[in-house]
Every structure is written in C-alpha cells, then in structure tokens.
Amino acid sequence: MAGAAAGGRGGGAWGPGRGGAGGLRRGCSPPAPAGSPRAGLQPLRATIPFQLQQPHQRRDGGGRAASVPCSVAPEKSVCRPQPLQVRRTFSLDTILSSYLLGQWPRDADGAFTCCTNDKATQTPLSWQELEGERASSCAHKRSASWGSTDHRKEISKLKQQLQRTKLSRSGKEKERGSPLLGDHAVRGALRASPPSFPSGSPVLRLSPCLHRSLEGLNQELEEVFVKEQGEEELLRILDIPDGHRAPAPPQSGSCDHPLLLLEPGNLASSPSMSLASPQPCGLASHEEHRGAAEELASTPNDKASSPGHPAFLEDGSPSPVLAFAASPRPNHSYIFKREPPEGCEKVRVFEEATSPGPDLAFLTSCPDKNKVHFNPTGSAFCPVNLMKPLFPGMGFIFRNCPSNPGSPLPPASPRPPPRKDPEASKASPLPFEPWQRTPPSEEPVLFQSSLMV
C-alpha cells in the first residue's frame, strides 16, 4: 500500500513523466542502479511514504479533507525504497501551479491519497478539526451591511431612544432661557418646533436649505445620527466662515423674498423691523435681509428725515431705497455697506439720481457766456505772403527816411510801391506779378502769416 501511494503521488503530483508511464506503475519499485533511467522517476526526498487511513475516518472529514492535506504521524513502512538520488524537476510550473491553487491531485481510480511533509511545513491536526467544524456548522453568510433588515431595526430603535432623551433634555434647557445671539424670530420658531413633532417620529431633520449649507453632511449620516434644531446647533451653523458656505438653492414661491421697500412711514413708525417669514429659506438671503433691517432700523429718525439723506429727494418726495444688496445692480438702487478706506472720499450713491432744487444753479463745465467775451483779432483764412516779410527791413526804413533827422518818421507802409527799373525788369524774366517782386536789398522770409497778434 505504501508503494502504491508513493507511485501514485509521483505520477499525479509531479507530472506525467514522473510516476512511471503516466502513473500506470503503482507497485513498489525495486532498487534501481544510479545510471538507469528509472532513477529519475522516483519522488522527491521531502515526500515520506505512509499507510492510508481507514475508510470511515475519511468519511468523517467530509469533502473538506480533499483540499487540506492530512496530518498523520509518519510511520515506517515495510516497503521502503532505497536511498534516492536527489534531482530537481524539469520545471517549477508543475509544482507551483497546484500549490498556489490549493488543489491537491487525486489518484486516477479516485482513491484518496494523502501525504505528510516535513515537520517544518507540517500542519497541526487541530487545524484540520477546526476547519471541519467551521465548514459543517457555519454556512457562508452575507456580511452585515446597511441594507440588512436586522441592522435597520437596531438603528431605528437607537434613533427613537436618542430622540426621547434629547427631547427631554432640550425641554429642560430651554426652560432656563439661555440667551441666543441672532434673530429672535428664528429662535421662537425653533423653540416651538420640537413639541410639535410626535414622540414616535423617526428622525428630526434639518430644513433642506440649512443642511445643504453644512460641509460634509450626507443624508445617510443625518439619518443615522439625530440632528436636532437646537440653539447650539444653530449657532454652529451660523459660525461657518465666509467662503465655506454653499449657495442657497433656488426655491419656489414660498422662499422667494422680495426686496424690502423702505418708506419714510415705516422708518418712523417701526424702530425695530422683524422679518415677514419666521422660517429661514436660505442662509445667505436670511442674513442679508436681517442685516439690512437691523442697520436701517438703527438709523435715527432725524437723520432719516433730513433732506441730505439719500432716501429722500430735494423736494421731500421719498425715493425707493432697497435693502443692502449682495451685488450692485445697474439701476443705481443699492447702498454700499462697506465704508471707504482711509484717505478716500465718501461719495453718495443717489447724488446722480436726485434732481437739483430751484435754488441751486445748474453747473456746467463751460464758462458763462455772459461774463466771458471773445473778440477775434484775425482770421485763419487770410492769404499768406511767402516772399515778403511781415515788417519791412531796417535798411528799407532808413532809406525812405527824409534828410531832416528832427522830422517824425512817416508810417511805414507794409507794401511799398514797386520801383520801375528797366535793368531789373530785363534781368528778371520770371513771370512774377508786380506785388510779388521784392527789392534786391530785402531778404526773403518764408512762411510768414498775415495774422495780427
């Protein structure tokens, strides 16, 4: 039996060429010389031959024993082969493929064969028993997930317990009347909301506009962990820094707040304005309207009723003043909330829209025509004398002077009469007109204008 096991192991585990003609030879092989071809067909030294167990022991192990090597103490068999010559296999693929897959080959006849390895790689017997018990008792169950009904029932029970404890705790804390920084209309709405819910309601959810503005808040986490609209929660929501708040989603007609038109009667009669709708629609629009109402309500009445206030025109008729807008609008109907930096002039926005009163004169950029007179001294379209200077030369003036030095100088004419010299007329055959000819003593000056300065 031991020889048959060794022969079958050699033929099935190490390939078709190792067990003697594809595993057909199952008897105990006689000792072969070292040079014979049968010497390479023997199993490796790490495999120790042993006797098979009884058939009833194999049935107790079940189908699990086929994939796990049996750990049996090696016994000295009667038919022990001679000391073998250690040789390596032709390829490691034949060994590693079955080893990595965890599939031990069986005999061709279906007989169960089992091999015991060295003690260094031997599996303890207790492991095999534990594996068998685990396979028989525990079937492969699906891991607990969020979709299982048992898990959902446990979560619903926990949520109901948390809700009851938080409702009782919040009722005691709100009776103490802790102050809340912010809008009191929202606080009153939040105080009235928890008792309105029945005790059996599964989850207290935040309003859709508020929970979208929180970062990292999923709907799954909100369902698991109960979020209550309490004072601490509201303060934590309102303390989100600028730039980290998501924009408010566009809502239907219930959440659309029209811009507040502030009339002088409203400013005088209502010193503290409250919001029309107590439930906040969007966090950004809610703070925006609240800041506009607080700042405009804090304005004193004398300042609001003064004619210099931008809410009024010169004739006393009120102009519609919108609340502090988030962005400027093209119709000049907004007020800047920020003050100008140091060194800059504060400019009123509504100065361009206001019409001047009857006592104020209309200022223009041009000078007044009644006070400024323009007296033209010449024209730009006068003819230009190219060959004659504007004033006669000094030589021409002294030449025309009389011999008496005490007599006054006659007024010099700008255009003297031409001299009739036959030699000069013969010498200059150029076709010049008489007024264009100049005496030889004068020097020509180019591009002289006839404008009188």
From Swiss-Prot:
Positions with biased composition (Pro residues): 406-416
- Swiss-Prot/TrEMBL keywords: Coiled coil, Phosphoprotein
Residue list for modification Phosphoserine:
29, 67, 178, 193, 201, 213, 319, 327, 413, 428
Cite the residue spans of the region called Disordered.
1-45, 159-201, 269-320, 406-453
Pfam families reported in the protein's UniProt record: FAM117
Q: Which stretches are annotated as coiled coil?
A: 149-175
* Keyword Coiled coil in annotation: yes
Query: Phosphothreonine-modified residues are where?
Result: 299, 354
* Compositional bias per record (Gly residues), positions renumbered to this chain: 1-25
The Low complexity compositionally biased stretches are 269-278
Q: Would the keyword Protease be found if you checked this record's keyword annotation? A: no
UniProt family annotation: Belongs to the FAM117 family.
Q: What is this protein called?
A: Protein FAM117A
The gene that this protein is the product of is FAM117A
